[in-house]
C-alpha cells in the first residue's frame, strides 16, 4: 500500500516513518528525502527515524545536513543515527506495528507492540 494512504487509513495516532540511506552520499540522500517528502510520505507522520549510515558526507554537506535540508521543515521529531538499517547492530522494526519512541539524554528507545 502507498505510504501516505496507509497513514491516513491505519495510523490514527500518526505514522512513524523509518528510513535509512544505505550507501548513498549526502547529496543523493537529500535528493531522495526531498522526493519522498514532496510525494507525501511524511504528511501523516508523527515522527521520523533515520538509520545510522556509513555513507560518506559530501564536500559541502554532511549526512545530518542532508536530512535537515530535506525534512527540517516538518513539524515532527526526527531521530538520527537510529540502530536500524544496514549498519550494525541491525535492529529490526516490524512494519505495521504500533510503536512508541522516547529519547532521553541522546539515548533512544523504540517499543513496538503487535495487534
Residue ranges and their predicted role:
Residues 1-33:
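ATP/pyrophosphate-binding catalytic subdomain of soluble kinases
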Residues 9-11, 41-42, 71-72, 92-93:
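Solvent-exposed alpha-helices and their adjacent loops that cap or buttress functional pockets
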Residues 27-41, 63:
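A short, acidic, amphipathic alpha-helical segment used as a generic capping/interface helix at domain edges
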Residues 52-115:
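ATP/nucleoside-binding phosphotransfer catalytic cores, i.e., glycine-rich phosphate-binding loops
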Amino acid at each position: 500500500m502507498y505510504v501516505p494512504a496507509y497513514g491516513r487509513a491505519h495510523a490514527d495516532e500518526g505514522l512513524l516513518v523509518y528510513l535509512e540511506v544505505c550507501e548513498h552520499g549526502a547529496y543523493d540522500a537529500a535528493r531522495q528525502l526531498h522526493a519522498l517528502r514532496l510525494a507525501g510520505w511524511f504528511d501523516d507522520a508523527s515522527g521520523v527515524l533515520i538509520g545510522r549510515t556509513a555513507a560518506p558526507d559530501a564536500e559541502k554537506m554532511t549526512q545530518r545536513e542532508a536530512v535537515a535540508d530535506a525534512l527540517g521543515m516538518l513539524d515532527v521529531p526526527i531521530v538520527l543515527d537510529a540502530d536500524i538499517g544496514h549498519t550494525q547492530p541491525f535492529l529490526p522494526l516490524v512494519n505495521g506495528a504500533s510503536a512508541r519512541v522516547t529519547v532521553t539524554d541522546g539515548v533512544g528507545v523504540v517499543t513496538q507492540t503487535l495487534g
